[in-house]
């Protein structure tokens, strides 16, 4: 089974890739290297004994996302970690964040709709906004 990990060379993504490979999945990493390093591939290989397939793709480019799924037709799941998360930068440059966090998600989902058997896991931003009035935080807040 082919599993795609977007943002797969980032901290959380690379650890996820290691775990997936360790249990036998064929992992395809998509990363645009804007906040990661190609050197992480070597680290994954040292840990697991196998380097994942790597595609340097900017998910904001719809045609690139379409071409990826045309090339890899056996994908059965996507774990989506590719997103921007810096609050200050998002206020200074909101359009970049809309493109990276929303448009790229939409392009992925449009392609996955063509594969009803595929599963999708979305990892939301690690940044939490606001101050909690009460702890623990309830599901209803």
Q: What is each stretch, according to the model?
A:
Residues 1-141:
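N-terminal Rossmann-like NAD(P)+-binding domain of SDR-like oxidoreductases, especially those catalyzing
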